[in-house]
Amino acid sequence: MKILVYLEKSDVRGGIEIFAERHVARLRAEGHEVEVVDCFSEKRMTAGDFDEVVVHKCSDVATLEKLPPEKTVYYVHDHEPICPRTYAYTPLKRNCSCAGGLWPCLFCAPLCRNWKSALKRVFAQKRRIAAMGRFKKLVVISEFMKSRLVANGLSADKITVEPPVLDGLDAEAERRGDGEGSAPPRLCVEKIDLLFVGQLIRGKGVQLLLAAMSRMKTPRTLDVVGTGNMEPKLKALAVQLGLGGRVRFNGFQTNPRDWMRAARCVVVPSFWQEPYGLVAAEAVALGRPVVAFAIGGLPEACGGKATLVPPGDVAALAKALDDNCEGA
């Protein structure tokens, strides 16, 4: 089968890009002929020449409207298709559960950093939802995201839930019985108590993790794997809270799973509505204790095998970290 895949180029290789790359690799391994194209690329493809069209990321509504509905499968990885601000998080620092539309989105959009782009998305929202509603299938990564699409007027009958494939980690864990890696981790540190893996942006909640560390009964170290615009502020906050010597910022690493295998506890302190939570799912599959806020798709990603605490509750997070590190 000939398949056309739309994947908008990004400067950051995040969860969407990783998911799409793995999906394309699986399709090719199954013998399909796959062509990947950016919806803004000069390289134009005629969808009619393909048996199926798969959309992983395409912010151009005009392109979506031209795709053949009977052939198109649309993967909804995050809030962007239904939230003009893209994060389902208001400028008033509140998670948003509203259905998209002129109201209340017209209130939010002008307060965004990229307000012009946000306003354009507000006025294109109705067209985008209509285009999505015509496609033969919509695929989401969690029941939580399915509920968000239904709240925005899309038919539940068209929506399929497909959690991310973890590259054999589930089978590996099942075979060994505990999910721990057999190869020694290749790390630049000797011991990891607490581990955070992800972008250093506000919604990922590292600032709440640092606050929780300052309340823990037993001092622990934290290794941070990842980069982002919050890094300077987080380093300053660690010093301000007296944690400077116990927090290591390790930057981007190519082997995050090795870090997870070596960690006493993997922490996912996101306070925005994570569509799923790939880091949490991978850590659980590797047999690592996980502590996370119970928000968005994180409870599903953890599969009942993590310690979940109320979103934003720093005291509860500190206690959960103490409990999970006890005896270490």
Describe every region a protein language model picked out.
Residues 18, 192-215, 229-235:
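A conserved mid-protein helix/loop that constitutes part of the nucleotide-sugar donor-binding site
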Residues 55-60, 76-79:
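Short His-centered aromatic/hydrophobic patch
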Residues 106-171:
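Donor nucleotide-sugar binding/catalytic pocket of nucleotide-sugar-dependent glycosyltransferases
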Residues 230, 244-253, 259:
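Active-site donor-binding acidic/aromatic loop of nucleotide-activated sugar
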Residues 257, 275, 280-285, 299-300:
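Short alpha-helical segment that forms part of, or immediately flanks, the ligand-binding pocket
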Residues 261-275, 288:
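Acidic donor-binding loop of glycosyltransferase active sites
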Residues 280, 295-308:
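Short acidic/histidine- and often glycine-rich active-site loop of Leloir-type glycosyltransferases
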Residues 304-314, 321-327:
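Conserved acidic donor-binding segment of nucleotide-sugar-dependent glycosyltransferases
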